[in-house]
A protein has these predicted regions:
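Conserved phosphoryl-transfer catalytic core
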Residues: 2-25
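Thiamine diphosphate
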Residues: 25-236, 240-247, 252-255
Length: 256
């Protein structure tokens, strides 16, 4: 873009130095002061943990902590996803997120209770019916080394599509979880039936889209999503129960 503007003899986009100075002398100084105070208070009993969090160094052995599902498991992939997410979040203090007022339906729920002014260590965020803001907030959390997830019905992905696109462009590992992935949602009617949405999000650059066929593929999807560091993942899950397909091919989910 810079080269194109030069070729067109256009003025370069610039910010006056006094604007930089103003922000450095106000917001930056205030932020640094608050950060030092917070770090001093919090690290008393959690020095090692806080260092790992700030450096994004927490790694999980997913094969050890996540279960496999046998042929008797016959549930929606949203339910399998909810149980897997709970295990991952319990074992990784970086995982934080929530839904656009649909947590009970998408079953994408954070741990340590709701985040609030009274519970700032809570890792479930009630974003409200604000899909676009939810995606933007989640991307901001990813910039600061946390492992955010956000969730809504798949038919509503259009409301947060710009956030997914920005995550791809910015190489952020935000996890977008969508449930109610087909016309099988039934009684909700055509407003809740995703038709063209899958094609749309699959066309977004640098975004992985996984629509697992059963619980074991769902496990692989979550392993992939929470292992990546340079691109977002969309996990598309079902409302209706799906049979577990006993196969060794679920490990090939990462191949697309």
């Amino acid at each position: 873009v810079v080269e194109m503007r030069n070729n067109l003899n256009s003025d370069p986009f610039s910010i006056p130095q006094e604007v930089y100075d103003y922000y450095r002398n106000t917001f930056v100084k205030r932020g640094n002061s608050c950060y030092r105070k917070w770090f001093k208070n919090y690290k008393i009993n959690k020095t090692e943990e806080i260092e790992k969090i700030l450096n994004g160094e927490i790694k999980l052995n997913f094969d050890e902590i996540l279960p496999s599902f046998d042929s008797s498991y016959n549930n929606p992939t949203r339910k399998a996803g909810g149980s897997l997410l709970n295990i991952i979040a319990t074992n990784n203090p970086l995982v934080i997120g929530g839904s656009a007022d649909l947590a009970s339906s998408t079953i994408a729920i954070g741990v340590d209770r709701d985040f609030s002014s009274q519970n700032k260590l809570g890792r479930h965020i009630n974003f409200g019916v604000r899909e676009h803001a939810m995606a933007a907030i989640s991307n901001g959390l990813a910039i600061h080394k946390l492992r955010p997830f956000c969730s809504t019905f798949f038919a509503f992905v259009d409301y947060l599509k710009p956030g997914i696109r920005m995550a791809g462009l910015s190489k952020l590992p935000t996890v977008f979880i969508f449930s109610h992935d087909s016309i099988a949602v039934g009684e909700d009617g055509p407003t809740h039936h995703p038709i063209e949405q899958l094609t749309m999000i699959r066309s977004i650059p640098n975004v992985d889209v996984i629509r697992p066929a059963d619980a074991n593929e769902t496990k692989e999807a979550y392993k992939i999503a929470f292992s990546k560091t340079d691109s977002p993942t969309c996990i598309v899950l079902s409302r209706q129960a799906l049979p577990t397909i006993l196969s060794e091919k679920e490990t090939e989910v990462s191949k697309g």
